[in-house]
């Protein structure tokens, strides 16, 4: 009560568990009922190590929660996160943030040029 920002973390919800996806849809509906126009932003966090399964995961989450942006995490290892290109294209939603570590300062705005260069690099 009286909060300006509410963060709902749905970690652990697998897109293959329809009952959990149904709960997610209900949570969104309840939030919208409590505050007209809410939620104001819904971001899907995708692990950079996720392969082609990430596209299916994103489609199901987008259907359940009306996702309007992607956060690509775990870019601090060898994973390059190329699946995010298919997600952004297929679902027509932008990649908004990238995570390169575990601290707040490791979360930064997505830069398409930097991402393309890193994706195509051999390192």
Predicted segments with their positions:
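P-loop/Walker A NTP-binding module and the surrounding RecA-like catalytic core of P-loop NTPases
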Residues: 1-123
């Amino acid at each position: 009560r009286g909060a300006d920002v509410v963060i709902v973390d749905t970690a652990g919800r697998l897109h293959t568990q329809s009952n959990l996806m149904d709960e997610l849809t209900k949570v969104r509906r309840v939030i919208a009922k409590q505050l007209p126009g809410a939620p104001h932003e819904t971001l899907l966090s995708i692990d950079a190590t996720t392969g082609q399964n990430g596209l299916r995961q994103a489609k199901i989450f987008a259907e359940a929660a009306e996702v309007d942006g992607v956060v690509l995490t775990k870019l601090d290892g060898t994973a390059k996160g190329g699946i995010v290109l298919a997600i952004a294209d297929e679902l027509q939603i932008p990649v908004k943030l990238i995570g390169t570590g575990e601290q707040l300062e490791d979360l930064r705005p997505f830069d398409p040029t930097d991402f393309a260069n890193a994706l195509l690099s051999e390192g």
